[in-house]
Structure formats: structure tokens, C-alpha cells
Amino acid sequence: MDLIRITDVQKTYKTGTVALYNFNLSISKGEFVFVIGASGSGKSTLIKMLYREEKPDRGSIIIGGINVAKLKNRKVYILRRKLGVVFQDFKLLPKLTVYENVAFAMEVFAYDKKQIYKRVMEVLDLVGLKNKVRQYPDQLSGGEQQRVVIARAIVNNPKLLICDEPTGNLDPI
């Protein structure tokens, strides 16, 4: 069974720009998939539709049995609990430290503080930021900010990890 099935998806913006037209894709559990294309070819639009920031004009997007296109706004959290998302523009919370930015992803799921501390420190060590826990996003390089975003995306062990240019700002660890 497919983890993701996208069928005949179309998205046209109000400006008339066609981002996706009759797009189809199936991804099975365990597959590692890259979507590549020129700037403006619809890659980021596709990603936004996968985590339901945007809806397609036509077609269906099924993720783990959930019809994303028909999901009511008040139920979007059900989908997002299963996803880890690495955004190309970071979306870090500027008034929170590195630790707090990553911990936030667990706090919304009501983990206890001990679980949060243990897991956040494991993940920050994994991405090479264990020594930056008290710093704020504006005190980090672009590559370090990107690693915080990656840590936040994986801290909850998501069933699906969606990345929009995840290595764009990374330096070697």
C-alpha cells in the first residue's frame, strides 16, 4: 500500500501561474524520493500541499489513508502529527532558544519534561548543536539554523519526513 498517493493534482494561483497540472505520484513506505525541477516548477507548492498549508484546485492527495485535500481545517493537526517538515526558510521562533525551538515540537504533543529534555538533547547532538542549546536563532549561522529546523522535524520520529531544500544552507558538521 502507498504511504502517499497523489492523483491528478492541479494548482493554479490567482495570478494565473500554473504550479502543478495533472500531477501524479505514488510513494511506498520506506522509499526515499527526490522531487527535482527548475525554480518555479511547483516543488514547494507540492510540499505545501503535502502538509496542508495549501489545497489543490483539483485532484486528491492521500497520506497514510488521510485525504489531505478534503481535510477540514480543525483536523489538520491529525495529519501534521505524522509529519516532520524541513522548510527552506527556517520558520524558527526568534524569541526561543535552540533548545526551546526543538522542544516546542514535542510540547504540542504533551510529552513530559523529562522525555522532552532527553530526546531534544539526543537530536541536537545528532545534528551537531548540543553546544548551542542556549543560543537564539539570530546568533546562529544559516547552516546552524537549518540544523535546528532539521532537529525540530525529526524530534518526534515522524512517519513521513518532508524537506524543502534541506541542505541549501548546510555546512559540513
Positions of predicted regions on the chain:
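Conserved ABC transporter NBD signature motif
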Residues: G59-N67
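Hydrophobic anchor residue at the start of the ABC signature
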Residues: I150
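Conserved ABC ATPase signature
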Residues: Q135-L140, E144-Q146
